[in-house]
């Protein structure tokens, strides 16, 4: 049976921690979409691990890991991450990671193009990670891309990469890019990559009857190419549909869909953010929460929890339970606000707006809660939480239509987690 972990907001919710926890009993952990633009941080045995393209399940010693067909894979990052895990003591990680031969290759060329495209937008920048994800998915959709399996075939990467480079040079002029260097590197990868490449359908067949397959979502629903705050989104399907498509999952095998919700809101890069706090409150959240991007190091914008957004996210992903994260970051706030509705021209909106211009203009209706003003760091039992923290959590559950909050994060370590019987 399959468990899917998905971000319910703008990303950076803390998906890696619940994935790490659940992967301890999982036979297989998979990434379905996205690339090395993702960033998941896990603290285990006082060691901090940063994941980008690799699934977080590699920390679990008995968990096999798969990078699925829906992903885009930057191979230098793939090998660099594997080496970093080995240096931190995960000596056998390279034996437990595989890549679908149908996944797309993300080249350094794509990163160069990403920067040029972003620069051309001037004052309307999307705020991408600059990792080349958008151009790579564009080449995939235009049927110009290279698949992982083709890296193993002599001459295929060189032929296709020369065509891609010529096309981008015709569009942008001279590029700050060494074509011959990248071709040479991929000639080396032809042998180096061989042990990791699998036919996904055949590979997954061995796990069809497994009681525990875990899917680790990347990014989040509000960055989904179809359902997010377009065009300020990533270039893949980040919701449950993307997981099913990218991993060829049987929908009837899905046992649970876990939505990961941060106890407040953050966003990296450009785009609408109705509950953003450009003030001392936002700065306090940013400082206490250490809100800097794992992938880019950029400062995250911060604001209050937005239940309008979370309800919209739930209506698309159909969460069976919620993991509420970083509750402890709110410990020192005198009062805590939660967005419950949007108004436009004095009227409550009945649905989540599709247009970013509308989101920029909405008036946010808040419910205000008294803070608990005591530490929740490291608490592992529900009954030990302050009463005001419990009320805050129960309100979120009601606003989510009764979807239970089963896990509550109270700190960075794996052990800093409350698991409720719900």
Swiss-Prot record:
Pfam families: Adenylsucc_synt. Pathway: Purine metabolism; AMP biosynthesis via de novo pathway; AMP from IMP: step 1/2. Its EC number is 6.3.4.4. The keyword Cytoplasm applies. It is an enzyme of class 6 (ligase). GO terms for molecular function: adenylosuccinate synthase activity; GTP binding; magnesium ion binding. Keywords: Cytoplasm, GTP-binding, Ligase, Magnesium, Metal-binding, Nucleotide-binding, Purine biosynthesis. IMP binds at residues 12-15, 37-40, 129, 143, 219, 234, 298. Its main location: cytoplasm. Mg(2+) binds at residues 12, 39. GTP binds at residues 11-17, 39-41, 300, 326-328, 409-411. Binds 1 Mg(2+) ion per subunit. It catalyses: IMP + L-aspartate + GTP = N(6)-(1,2-dicarboxyethyl)-AMP + GDP + phosphate + 2 H(+). It is found in: Cytoplasm. CDD domains: AdSS. Substrate binds at residues 294-300. Its cofactor is Mg(2+). One of its GO terms (cellular component) is cytoplasm. Plays an important role in the de novo pathway and in the salvage pathway of purine nucleotide biosynthesis. Catalyzes the first committed step in the biosynthesis of AMP from IMP. HAMAP family: Adenylosucc_synth. Homodimer. Belongs to the adenylosuccinate synthetase family. This is Adenylosuccinate synthetase. It comes from Ajellomyces capsulatus (strain NAm1 / WU24) (Darling's disease fungus).
């Amino acid at each position: 049976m399959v468990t899917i972990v998905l971000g319910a907001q703008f990303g950076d919710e803390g998906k890696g921690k619940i994935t790490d926890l659940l992967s301890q009993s999982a036979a297989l952990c998979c990434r379905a979409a996205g690339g090395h633009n993702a960033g998941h941080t896990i603290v285990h045995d006082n060691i901090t691990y940063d994941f980008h393209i690799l699934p977080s399940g590699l920390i679990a010693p008995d968990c096999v890991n798969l990078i699925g067909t829906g992903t885009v894979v930057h191979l230098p990052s793939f090998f660099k991450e594997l080496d970093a895990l080995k240096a931190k003591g995960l000596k056998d990680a390279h034996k437990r990671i595989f890549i679908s031969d149908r996944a797309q290759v993300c080249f350094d060329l794509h990163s160069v193009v990403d920067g040029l495209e972003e620069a051309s937008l001037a004052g309307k920048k999307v705020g991408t990670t600059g990792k080349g994800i958008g151009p790579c998915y564009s080449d995939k959709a235009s049927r110009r891309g290279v698949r992982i399996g083709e890296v193993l075939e002599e001459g295929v990467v060189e032929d296709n990469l020369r065509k891609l480079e010529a096309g981008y040079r015709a569009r942008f002029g001279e590029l700050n890019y060494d074509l011959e260097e990248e071709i040479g590197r991929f000639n080396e990868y032809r042998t180096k990559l061989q042990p990791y490449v699998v036919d996904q359908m055949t590979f997954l067949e061995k796990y069809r009857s497994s009681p525990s397959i875990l899917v680790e979502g990347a990014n989040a629903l509000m960055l989904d190419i179809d359902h997010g705050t377009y065009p300020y989104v990533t270039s893949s399907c980040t919701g449950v549909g993307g997981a099913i498509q990218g991993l060829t999952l049987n929908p009837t095998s899905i046992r649970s869909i876990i939505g990961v919700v941060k106890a407040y809101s953050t966003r990296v890069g450009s785009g609408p953010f109705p509950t953003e706090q450009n003030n001392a409150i936002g700065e306090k959240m940013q400082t206490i929460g250490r809100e800097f991007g794992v992938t880019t190091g950029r400062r995250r914008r911060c604001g209050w929890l937005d239940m309008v957004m979370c309800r919209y996210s739930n209506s698309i992903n159909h969460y069976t339970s919620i993991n509420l994260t970083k509750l402890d970051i709110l410990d020192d706030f005198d009062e805590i606000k939660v967005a419950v509705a949007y108004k436009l021209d004095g009227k409550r909106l009945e649905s989540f707006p599709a247009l970013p211009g509308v989101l920029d203009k909405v008036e946010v209706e808040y419910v205000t809660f008294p803070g608990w003003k005591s530490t929740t760091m490291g608490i592992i039992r529900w009954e030990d939480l302050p009463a005001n923290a419990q009320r805050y959590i129960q309100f979120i559950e009601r606003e989510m239509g009764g979807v239970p909050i089963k896990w509550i994060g109270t700190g960075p370590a794996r052990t800093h987690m409350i698991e409720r019987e719900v």
